[in-house]
């Protein structure tokens, strides 16, 4: 379990190191566009919120994996299902919480900085752009990471252990 957790953590840090310059270019390009710096700030906050939610979700899921396997072995399927359900619900609650805190904080800030409700709404749209950019990269990168781990496990099973193809 520790190896899975460590591998997932290394993947997340590597992914975010690659993603940070992409988000930075997006923020700077938006800042110099007619959309303005308020929208650029919302993009940055949305990207940060999504990245934090993704990291917390990955951390909790890898921790829940070990606990679920242990519970299945020692206590049976009911206990394992309960642990896996609550371990997975952390991600959903974290995404909703980060969205509410991020959008709420931006709305509070923008209503004090701007008078026009249309400009506030346009600026808040940047939050979704930033969050979606990180989610897209995480989805695609995570799929590639998962497939490469699957292929590696298949090769080890066939070559090292002599396990036939399933």
Which residue stretches match the model-derived regions?
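Hydrophobic, small-residue-rich transmembrane alpha-helices and their short perimembrane loops
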Residues: 1-166
